[in-house]
Amino acid sequence: EPRKFDPTFRGPVYNRGCTDVLCCVLFVIVILGYIALGTVAWIHGDPRKVIYPTDSTGQFCGQKGTPNAKKAILFYFNILKCASPAVLINLQCPTTQMCVSKCPDRFATYTDMQLLYRFNKSHWDYYKQFCKPGFNNPQKSVAQVLRDEDCPSMIVPSRPFLQRCFPDFITRNGTLTVANKTAFKDALDTARSVTELRDAANGITSIHEAKEVGMKIVEDYASCWYWIVIGLFIALVISLIFILLLRFTAGFLLWFIIFAVILLVAYGIWHCYWEFAVLRETPGADVTISDIGFQTDLHVYLQLSQTWLVFMVTLGLTEASIVLMLIFLRKRVRIAIALLREGSRAISYIMSALFYPIITFVLLAICISYWAMTALFLASSGDAVYKVASGNPNCKYANQTCSPESFNRTNITKQCPGAQCLFAFYGGESLYHRYIFILQLCNLLVFLWLVNFTIALGQCTVAGAFASYYWARRKPADIPPCPVFSSFSRALRYHTGSLAFGSLILAVVQLIRVILEYLDHKLKGAHNAFARFLLCCLKCCFWCLERFIRFMNRNAYIMIAIYGKNFCTSAREAFYLLMRNVVRVAVLDKVTDFLLFLGKLLIAGSVGVIAFFLFTRKIPIIQEEVPVLNYYCVPLLTVILGSYLIAHSFFSVYAMCVDTLFLCFCEDLERNDGTTAKPFFMSPGLKRILGKAEQSPKKSRG
């Protein structure tokens, strides 16, 4: 039921006790366990297993202080035995793998080498660097060499990629070649096609192209990083100026934002139409995006009329949505602007709240770093596991574990000629190694819990600070000193358990969503329509559930900051308070978020326009200072995204301020009636907008 009038109530309760102590204890135990997990992973893990490729004997390629120190590249004796690039990268190709200092640069076979060796021994000197260390018998028969895999049967021109030698595929006039050849012969004088190499390493060409794009992007970042920093600094300054201007010109500025965004999107529509109209008359520009497929040169897409048509339609739908919202929700927009004006006034009294996101950022950076390092060490835990590799499909010992030291003394080599004991992967049969996957899930769950707790702590801190502003009768005289620090200490001292409780609920739902995404990825190639439909429904339901829990947690933290009760009680009271004001909540909350989103969009868009003219060298004054870029859109998108995130960090405080003031406003309406005996705490401007004028003393007495 609605709260009763309490003449002694003055905002956040100071006399409070610890809440959800059991969850607090559990949270502390989990953190200690998480530290223990990281320690165990650090002891058993070895990042070198991820950083360096490993040869058939389990030795790292390129590791300092070892015989392979100057051999940083992995070479495959017979790449034709490899089924796919995934097999290569997972180091499970059934052929000998050896560390080399460089990849082959020519076609050659062991048979040709033996013939040429009689006349020139330099052929063997070159070929033997791709043979097993210590092998120096070029007279050994081809059959025996291939059986024992002392040397590769052939070598092909290759280049290093992912620290592994892959065939150097080059497309010439639409034909796939290696060293300008489309065919070659192996050691058994069998004709081979370059297509077979491509099939053995399917997808390597596209990956290589992606690598080239990545290298060009890195070059762009290296040459213009300081311009990116300047752009982000401009976004920071604009965001601060924007927040300060809201204090004095909230109404004007917000209406300016609305119409500025409308004009900005309208300009985008006009520019897209102009580009579309020009390209429509250009020969060859009518090709569709699907026809050209993936291109490493991103400028190709900007030469297509369809690209600009897609941009134009997208911006047109955005423009229509904004205009329709303004037409049908203009009254709610006025109320939202009044709330934002009140929020700007509150922030002007508590400016320190704007810098609290720095603390959140530092804590999140620590959480992310610890999770990433723990995941890396867990993934690299385990001992070297060796398995029998045989080219004979009838070998019954194939894929069984083996020991390199005793392999030659077993019967496997007799029953399966040519079989070898090769390194397969890192793992183990101990209890720790068997539950690596479970430990990774635990690592992810605790990471999500800590991230959500960090965000919850920030929300509760900011809510407590702004609640003390709203419930102060005389502003700023009745606002307590250091409201942000006081609210932070209260939240951490008394309500760690409650914040951990709400964060855990959200973390569990997020973990379920991650698992569903993983299952969806695994079932992409499945033909079970019912399973796909069920999975799609579950993903949709849990997405909605996560959004609802986020909304309820946010309001529960506000109630915790004000009344100091446990999580369940605070969530229930917040829910009922919102339900009693459901008409206001349903529209006002989203309208306020929409206005703040427009502000973030305007800041990111404005900085983005400046960055566009800068990176395309269209500003004459500094044209010579700006480097020529391969893909100007990459640093441009970086500046736009970074500007949006910077604006979001400031506006997140603003949004929490408005949500807190709105909840306090709803309580104010229930506690007080505007009479002299029960005056409202809301500002005159907010009362005027809502039509809640003070009642006369005569009416209150009557």
Swiss-Prot record:
Record field: transmembrane: 21-41, 226-246, 250-270, 309-329, 335-355, 358-378, 444-464, 499-519, 594-614, 633-653
The record's listing under InterPro entries reads: Choline_transptr-like
* Keywords from the named record: Antiport, Cell membrane, Glycoprotein, Membrane, Transmembrane, Transmembrane helix, Transport
**Cytoplasmic-side segments:** 247-249, 330-334, 379-443, 520-593, 654-699
Pfam families in UniProt: Choline_transpo
Membrane-topology annotation of the record: Multi-pass membrane protein
Report the SS bond pairs.
none
Q: Which GO terms describe its molecular function?
A: antiporter activity; choline transmembrane transporter activity; transmembrane transporter activity
The function of this protein is: Choline/H+ antiporter.
Supply the PANTHER family for this chain.
CHOLINE TRANSPORTER-LIKE (SLC FAMILY 44) (PTHR12385), CHOLINE TRANSPORTER-LIKE PROTEIN 5 (PTHR12385:SF42)
User: Can you name this protein?
Assistant: Choline transporter-like protein 5-A
Q: Which gene encodes it?
A: slc44a5a
